[in-house]
Amino acid sequence: MMSIPMELMSIRNPNSTLLYRAHSRPPVKLCAPPRSLLPSRRHFSAPRAVVSYPGIRFGFTSPEVLLNRSVVAFAASHEDSGESGVEVGKEKSDIDVEDDTSKEAWKQTLESFKEQVSKMQSVSSEAYSVNSQKAMTVLKETSEQLRIQAEKAKEELGTKAKVVSEEGREYILKAAEESPSDVKEIVEAFASTEDLKNVSRANDFHVGIPYGLLLLVGGFINFMVSGSIPAIRFGVILGGALFALSLASLKSHRKGESSTKFLKGQMAIVAIIFLRELRLLLSQKSTFLGFFTTLTSGGVLGFYLYKMVVKREKGPTLEDGGEDESSDGFVRSEG
C-alpha cells in the first residue's frame, strides 16, 4: 500500500487545510485491484485514488494511468485491424480460388457440350444420308411401279375404247338402217371419217351438224327454263338454220355437187353468233357459259374459214366434170 500526504491534495482543493486539521490521519490509500481481477487487454481498469472522510468519499484517476489506458486501447485496435486485414485477405484469396474453380468448371462444361454437339451433328448427318438414300431408292421403285401400272392401264383403256367404239358403230349402223333417210345419211357420214382425227379430212357438215343441233337444243331448253327471247333468236332460229344448211351440204356432197354456197351460209350464221357473244364478253355481261359459247363459235368460224381457203386453192369445182375422191370415202361422179 502507498500513502499520500494530504498536503498534495491542496493543489486540487484550496480548502484542504480544513481537511488536514480535522483529520491528519488516516492517510490516503491507493487501492489497486488484484492481478487476477484485471480484464483482458481490450478492457483495462486503472487504479483510482480514494480519499476517505467521514460521510464524504473522493476519488480521481492518475494521468499516468490514463496514458497507459490510451496506449493499451491503441494497441488493441491495431491488433484488431491487423486481424481483420488478415481475415479479409483470406476471404479474398478464397473468393479468387472459387472464381478460378468456377471458370475451370465452366470451361469443362463448354468443352463437353461442344463434344456432344459435334457427336450429334455427325450422327444426324450420317442418319440423314442413310435415310435420304433409302428414300430415293423407295421413290425410284415406286415411280417405276406407277409407270408400269400407268402403261398397263393405258393399254387396257385403249383396248376397251376400241371395243366400245366398234360396238357403238355397229349399233349406230344398225339403227341407221331402220331410221329415215336423213338420219341414215348423217350416221353414215360420221361413221366413215375415222373419228375425225385429221382436220383437213373433215368437211363443213361434220362440224355444222353437231354444232347446229347443239344450238337448237340448247336454245330451246334455255327458253323453256328462263323464257329468254335471245335464246329463241340465237339458239333455236340460228341453230336450226345452221343445222339445215349442214344437212343440205351433206346431201350435195353425196350427190357430187358443190357445197360452197352452203359453206358460206354456215360461215355467216356462225359469224353472227360469234360477234354477238364477243360483244357480251367485252361488255362484261357474259358468264362462264357465255365465254364457252364465244370460244366454241370462234373455233367453228375458224374451221369454216380454213375450209373456204382450201376450196379456193383447189380451183374449179367438180361441177365442170371429172372425179374426185373425198375424205370420207365417197366418190363424186361427173355431173
UniProtKB/Swiss-Prot annotation:
For all TMEM14 proteins, 4 hydrophobic alpha-helical domains are predicted. However, NMR structure determination of the human TMEM14A showed that only 3 of these helices are membrane-spaning while the amphiphilic N-terminal helix is probably located at the lipid micelle-water interface. GO terms for biological process: embryo development ending in seed dormancy; fatty acid transport; positive regulation of triglyceride transport; regulation of fatty acid metabolic process. InterPro entries: TMEM14, TMEM14_sf. It comes from Arabidopsis thaliana. It is a multi-pass membrane protein. This is Protein FATTY ACID EXPORT 3, chloroplastic. Residues 88-101 have a biased composition (Basic and acidic residues). Its main location: plastid.
